[in-house]
Amino acid sequence: MKEIFFAVPGDIKTQSGGYIYDRRLALELGLQGRSLTHLELGNSYPNPTNAHASDAALALLALPADSIVIIDGLALGAMDAEVVAELKAQLVALVHHPLALEGDLDHTRRESLFNSERINLGHAKRVIVPSPHTAQLLISDYSVSPDRITVARPGIDRPDGTASLRNPPLILSVGIQVPRQGHDVLLRALASIKQLRWNATIAGPALDADYA
């Protein structure tokens, strides 16, 4: 059975949806008896410093040909295409969301990320995505063939005990505070039901201070 390396930029213990997904993926692979080694890449991705890009290239190019490397899309989409093309290990891409679709990117940077991610995905033996929507984006815009895509939907563990009813109800929205998460859509919808009593909490790091 091939050894698996999992390359993730930054601290995998970070409390965000993407990192929680990564941790659960690593856990499930371990429960299946797979040997998995975590490779921590620099935390500057998707805009890596020269040092972080160089360190990542050295670590990834050193992986043996009889191994598998899963690279989180936050890093893979911004990597030098020549480095990715030279990988000896079998590449599996994990794409949470295409980098070029993030908000607040100028045209030049958006085009650069789109091109690098499209090229790098072309080298992946398999691509893991969290939703059919992301899968369709990669098929239609990034030339990823459907037979290479695995949709692994995220989920939550079933809670113990019986949930208590709250009055008024609490509406909880969890996710990083950036435009594509749509917290503003939720707030506008809630503003239209002022005749009802409710509480709402938005929980997640403010990665876009102006939006938050």
Enumerate the language-model features and the residues they cover.
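N-terminal beta-loop-helix "entrance" segment that forms/cooperates
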Residues: 42-60
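Glycosyltransferase donor-sugar binding loop
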Residues: 199-212
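Conserved donor-binding/catalytic core segment of Leloir-type glycosyltransferases
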Residues: 156-158, 162-181, 187-192, 200-203
